[in-house]
Amino acid sequence: MLPYMDQVLRAFYQSTHWSTQNSYEDITATSRTLLDFRIPSAIHLQISNKSTPNTFNSLDFSTRSRINGSLSYLYSDAQQLEKFMRNSTDIPLQDATETYRQLQPNLNYSVSSGNTLSSDNTTVDNDKKLLHDSKFVKKSLYYGRMYYPSSDLEAMIIKRLSPQTQFMLKGVSSFKESLNVLTCYFQRDSHRNLQEWIFSTSDLLCGYRVLHNFLTTPSKFNTSLYNNSSLSLGAEFWLGLVSLSPGCSTTLRYYTHSTNTGRPLTLTLSWNPLFGHISSTYSAKTGTNSTFCAKYDFNLYSIESNLSFGCEFWQKKHHLLETNKNNNDKLEPISDELVDINPNSRATKLLHENVPDLNSAVNDIPSTLDIPVHKQKLLNDLTYAFSSSLRKIDEERSTIEKFDNKINSSIFTSVWKLSTSLRDKTLKLLWEGKWRGFLISAGTELVFTRGFQESLSDDEKNDNAISISATDTENGNIPVFPAKFGIQFQYST
């Protein structure tokens, strides 16, 4: 489940019209969400409150080997945070959890018909207006968190300098570990590409990220290729000035919709030339209540590979919104009645309605001009070709919009998430839902392999409440056991 402060941060980005979908850091966010979701390792309780329209507080408790907790505080001078924030009772489940990310094609200034809030879908018309608004007001966000009993501190400051630029400062301080790290980010987003300059006091690390979007210019006919597909290419470069350790990677992402069903899908291909690691992912919304993801990893140097799968199954509420009662899983193309009857009554004409009638134009030609039969036939063929092509585009666009509207108008009560890896031989199960105003996450990670604990870090071993005893390894047979198990409650007002 998305932590409360992350929900506030998302609301800040939406209120200031900053889109995170252009960030190279989030270029593979969809596959990470479906495959690497976090499993609670203890009993966790989070209580949050919006004390004023601009201040937010959160208190966390967890019981692992001992009682741990943290206290968070956030302040922002953004004026429309309450428009995007919901308490745990009112927030839709698809907005409270991390799930498949539907991207908003860049430079597409058509008005979206969905009303449901999304972490990455901002109103593009507002973005366009903001980019040309000379009265831009700088906004800021201040966040701090203290952990106990360790007394570790973390802080973050975000400053919107202009409609295209943003400055971010993050800091972590740990007295026990004698660790103090400060990281600065300067981001510039032109919609076509986002550039990010990074500097960290840890090893004097310098970094540069860039992500460039292709297929972003609308065509003359507003076709589905330009409106519903996007191709992005990004890269990152790192250098530690103290140790002179370099790092780099590049990723290609393609996002589109199926023109037959309207369902979105995302493809990514990543490459790290220094470590020889290649990764490809395929993520798709297979239905309004199901999602599937597959990931293949391969290393050129060690010849090791891994195949991972993840999926989601959403449970809908039986009583849906009035506009969604008669919806079914079959998505029909645009009806002839909508196409042919009274087109002037609609606010926006369909594309094929803008094609001029060449036959009527010919009839207006003076009778003194004699048009040969073969030219008349050519005019008729052109009229039919343009009209049928644009009609097909309208049908594809209508199918995609119907699928999006079905998701936006659905009320989901719970979701099951599953993820498995063939090399690690693990199975992660997570259930998330709402109960009496609480957002609940409960899950476990099942292990099927002997070498699992040897592959864990010391922190992960300490987090696991259950371990394999010596008797479990008798005869080389290890039973299935839960390496992690926990439940998390969130409540906010």
Swiss-Prot record:
Keywords: Membrane, Mitochondrion, Mitochondrion outer membrane, Transmembrane, Transmembrane beta strand. GO terms for biological process: establishment of mitochondrion localization; mitochondrial genome maintenance; mitochondrial outer membrane translocase complex assembly; mitochondrion-endoplasmic reticulum membrane tethering; phospholipid transport; protein insertion into mitochondrial outer membrane. This is Mitochondrial distribution and morphology protein 10. Lacks alpha-helical transmembrane segments, suggesting that it resides in the membrane via beta-sheet conformations similar to those predicted for other outer membrane proteins and porin. Its main location: mitochondrion. GO terms for cellular component: ERMES complex; SAM complex. The keyword Acyltransferase does not apply. Belongs to the MDM10 family. HAMAP family: Mdm10. It is a multi-pass membrane protein. It is found in: Mitochondrion outer membrane. Component of the ER-mitochondria encounter structure (ERMES) or MDM complex, composed of MMM1, MDM10, MDM12 and MDM34. Associates with the mitochondrial outer membrane sorting assembly machinery SAM(core) complex, which consists of SAM35, SAM37 and SAM50, to form a SAM(holo) complex. Component of the ERMES/MDM complex, which serves as a molecular tether to connect the endoplasmic reticulum and mitochondria. Components of this complex are involved in the control of mitochondrial shape and protein biogenesis and may function in phospholipid exchange. MDM10 is involved in the late assembly steps of the general translocase of the mitochondrial outer membrane (TOM complex). Functions in the TOM40-specific route of the assembly of outer membrane beta-barrel proteins, including the association of TOM40 with the receptor TOM22 and small TOM proteins. PANTHER family: MITOCHONDRIAL DISTRIBUTION AND MORPHOLOGY PROTEIN 10 (PTHR28035:SF1). InterPro entries: Mdm10.
